[in-house]
Amino acid sequence: VVILKEETTGEIKGFNLFNASKYMELDAQGLVEVTPELAEKIAAALAANGAEVSLDVDFSPKFVVGYVEEKEKHPNADKLSICKVNVGEETLQIVCGAPNVEAGQKVVVAKIGAVMPSGLLIKAGNLRGVDSFGMLCSARELAIPGAPEVKGILVLDTDAEVGSAFVTPTK
């Protein structure tokens, strides 16, 4: 086990559990939903490897279905758009560089605190002077098996429920 800590504060930011398959079975590729059961297995594996910590886990979904209510051109960047995206309980402002984003689409939103399959942590940011509170995701960024190598976000079917957790499809 490697414990990742903030250098200045010593706050624990994450763990790297080597050979995790010895402690738990993960059926999914790409996004893995952390359930209370999975958190218990992770805590037990950490304890078995000498890491005496308590896990404080937020079980709210971090990858959700969103509805692009508005899209406007970014005032300081030709290839960026400012989107207002309804994610169920709130509407988020998200700056997006995908060429195919349009108002009226249902999309996958990585909310603040999401960890992409690549390891990228989603946090609030500012892109060319405009605040952004999440990310609209492509199939490739979500590590969906067989995802096409095309530019742009993943546009979902119209029957996808806004605010519901997005789960990686299995073929």
Describe each PLM feature range.
Residues V1-K171:
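Phosphate-backbone binding interfaces of nucleic-acid-interacting proteins
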